């Protein structure tokens, strides 16, 4: 009798655990699917500006400004180490890509030497190929509500999609509830914040600097 009662209790406990896991996974899947749908219109935009600030260490900061308007692209990378800045700007006119490098000692222009601009990887870290993948990656995920720079966000931890950048010990994406845009990324000790503009990029942004101020490095 005691054995049967014990087995019944164990069965009830297992059932409760299974139900809790199902509820957890269904909730996460619904939230993530909703964010995927909301961000889609922004991911398809060809008129935008993304600013990403990454604190790599106490003395090192990386600032990325990425602009696109139709076929025109501009990517500005600034790396600041102990208050010394290196700035690299890539201008894509649609026919070629020109690179301008600035340090405290020199300015160098390289015209047509780069084949591709690689900027901010994605507007969303929640990319999956299908619903089954979303469900699978939702299982270990932890989601809570947070505020990032006055934006209401979901803090999504351990969504371990192969399309994401992943930390060794911590992977956290804070994603705006209203738009699905990622506002903050935490990969271990590295913290990145992002800001966005859409449908408001002026052509003047893509005007290259005065090349006479630079040393021209010939294409090899």
Regions found by a protein language model. Give the residues of each.
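Non-transmembrane domains of secretory- and envelope-associated proteins
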Residues: 5-11, 140, 151, 168-169, ...
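A short, surface-exposed beta-strand/turn
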Residues: 67-69, 90-95, 169-186
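Short, hydrophobic/aromatic-rich segments at coil-to-beta transitions
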Residues: 44-51, 70-76, 148-158, 179-184
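Generic short beta-strand segments
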Residues: 51-56, 80, 156-162, 188
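Glycine-centered tight beta-turn/hairpin loop motif at sheet-sheet or coil-to-beta transitions
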Residues: 57-59, 82-85, 103, 164-168, ...
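An acidic-aromatic
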Residues: 65-126, 192-195
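Flexible, processing/modification-adjacent segments and terminal tails
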Residues: 28-35, 43, 95-165
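N-terminal leader/targeting segments and the immediate start of mature chains
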Residues: 2-72, 204-220
């Amino acid at each position: 009798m005691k054995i049967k009662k014990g087995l019944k209790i164990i069965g009830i406990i297992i059932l409760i655990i299974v139900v809790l896991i199902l509820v957890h996974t269904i909730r996460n899947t619904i939230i993530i699917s909703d964010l995927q749908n909301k961000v889609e219109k922004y991911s398809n935009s060809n008129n935008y500006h993304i600013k990403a600030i990454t604190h790599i260490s106490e003395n090192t900061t990386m600032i990325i400004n990425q602009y696109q308007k139709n076929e025109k692209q501009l990517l500005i990378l600034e790396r600041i180490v102990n208050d010394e800045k290196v700035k690299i700007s890539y201008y894509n006119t649609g026919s070629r890509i020109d690179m301008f490098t600035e340090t405290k000692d020199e300015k160098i222009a390289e015209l047509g030497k780069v084949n591709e601009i690689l900027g901010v990887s994605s507007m969303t870290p929640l990319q999956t190929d299908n619903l089954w993948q979303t469900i699978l990656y939702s299982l270990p995920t932890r989601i809570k509500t947070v505020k990032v720079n006055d934006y209401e966000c979901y803090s999504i931890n351990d969504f371990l999609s192969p399309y994401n950048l992943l930390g060794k010990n911590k992977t956290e994406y804070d994603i705006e509830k209203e738009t699905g845009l990622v506002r903050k990324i935490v990969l271990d000790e590295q913290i990145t914040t992002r800001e966005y503009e859409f449908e408001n990029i002026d052509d003047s942004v893509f005007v290259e600097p005065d090349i006479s101020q630079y040393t021209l490095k010939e294409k090899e």
